[in-house]
Amino acid sequence: MKCNTLKLTEQDQFINKIKNSESQITSFYEYDAAKKESFYRRLKTPNNGREFHLSRVIKSYMNELKLTHQQLNNIDALADGAKVVIGGQQAGLFGGPLYTFHKIFSIITLSRQLSEEYDTPIVPVFWIAGEDHDFEEVNHTYAFNNKETTLKKVKYHTMTPPDSNVSRYTPDKNELKASLNHFFKEMKETVHTQDVYQMCVNIINQFDSWTDIFKGLIHEVFKDYGILFIDAQYPELRQMEKPLFKEILEKRNQIDQSFRETQIRKTQQQLPSMIQTETNTHLFIHEDGMRQLLNFDGTYFKLNKTEKRYTKQNLLDIIEREPERISNNVVTRPVVEEWLFNTVAFIGGPSEIKYWAELKDVFDTLNVEMPIVMPRLRITYLYARTKKLLKQYNLSIESVIANGVEQERQHFVREKASNNFINEVEEMKIQQQELYNNLFTYVENNHDNQLLLEKNNQIHLNQYDYLIKRYLLNIERENDISMRQFREISETLHPMGGLQERVWNPLQIMNDFGIDVFSPTTYPPLSYSFDHLIINP
C-alpha cells in the first residue's frame, strides 16, 4: 500500500487557517496546533494526579477483551503518568463511516510521532461517545454495489429505538445480523468476504450492548497498535467525574455566560456559531427511561421531555449516589474529557474543532487548560480501477474529490451529441419568441389575451427544452457504459457530494483488500498532515 499527500482546493478554509497559524482562528484556542513549541510546552504541564485511577478504570472497561501486550504496556504507561493523545466518536453501525477509523489512525499516528520525537511514552486513547442518544445518526451505513455502481443504504431496523444513551441499548441480535447480511449482499464477494463476515458475526455473538459491539470491532482491528478505549457512559468513569459534575452544576451560570460570550466574539470574527443549544445547565439526566436535558428556570431544574423538576440539592445528591445518570452536552463534554486525562492533543473532525473554538472560556471557568486541538487526518482510498477510469476520462483526482464529476460528465455527453441538432432547436426557440413578440402587438390592449399568449409561448418553449433534455438523455443511454463509469468514479471519490470517508464503511475496504488491511503489517506508516492523504491499496 502506498500513501501520497494531496493538496485540495477547499471552500472551507478553517483547517488551512490553522495550518497557517492565522490569529483569526488561533486566538480561540489555548495552543497553536501548527507550532512545534506548543507540543513542547504542553508536554511540560504537570499531571492532574488522576492517571493511576483512570488506568484502572480503563483496564476494567477493556477487561472482556483479549488485550495485546501493546495495550497492556500502554495501560501501565498511563498509570505511571504518561500523557495521551485522545479523540472520540459515536458508535456507528459496523464501525460507522470511514472517518471513525481515520480518527483512530490520527490518534495512533500523532501519539507515535510525539513518543519518538520527545522520547517519552504518549498513549493513544479513543473515547466512545456512548452517552449520545440520537440513534438515527448511528443506526445506518452504506455499501457500494458494484453491479449497479451505486451506494446502498443499510439500516438496523427496530420498532423501539432507544430514548436514552446508546450505551444502555441492547440491539436485537437477529435484526443486527439481518442488517449485516444485507450489507454483505450489496457488496461483491471476494476471497476476503467470508473472513470479514465471520469476524462481524463473532463480535455480535460475543457482545450485547450497542457500544460494546462497536468496541469489539474497533478492538479487533486496532488492538496491535496498542490503542486504549473508554466509553463516556461507563459507570466507573462516571464515579470519577462526580467532583466535576458538582462543579459544573455550581458554576452553570458562569459556564453558560462564558460559552455564549465566546460565540459572540467568534461571530464578530466572521466565523459562524457551531453549537446550537438553549440549555443554561449543559447537563443531561437519565429519567423515566430517557436521556433528558436539564434547564434551570430560576427556581428548579426542569426536564425537556417530562414534567419532573429538581432542586440543586436533589441533583447534587443524584451526582453523589448515581453519577451514571448524569451526562454532558456538547459544551461540557470536552472539559470533562480533558479533566480526566493528561492530554497533549485532542483530535477532532472538521466540525468538532470548530465547536471547540467556542469553549476556551468554558475550560478556563472550570480551571482546566484546553489541550492542543488538532484536525484529524483526512484519507481517501484510490482503487486501481478508479485510477484507471480517471486516466481514461482525463480527470484530475484533486478536482473529482473536491467537486465530483457532474460537469465533466455533462461535457462528455455534449461532445457525443450533435451540435447542429442542438443549435437548430435553440434557433427554433429564438424564432418562436420573435413570432410571439409580433403577436403581442395585436393584443396589447387586451390583458386576458396577453396572459393567454404568455402561457402558450411558455408551453412551446418548455417543449423545446424538453426536446433537448430527452435528446441528451438518449445520448446518455447510448453511452451507458461511460455513464456507469462516471457514476462509479463519483460514488467512489465524491459520494453524496462529499468525501469518501464520510459515507463509505471500513468493512468495504476490508472486504476488498483483506481482514488485516488496517493492521500495522499492511497499512502504510502515516505522518501527521493537515493535507489530504491518498492511499493506494
UniProtKB/Swiss-Prot annotation:
Keywords: Coiled coil, Ligase. Residues 415-439 form a coiled coil. Its EC number is 6.-.-.-. One of its GO terms (molecular function) is ligase activity. Belongs to the BshC family. NCBIfam families: thiol_BshC. Involved in bacillithiol (BSH) biosynthesis. May catalyze the last step of the pathway, the addition of cysteine to glucosamine malate (GlcN-Mal) to generate BSH. This is Putative cysteine ligase BshC. The gene is bshC.
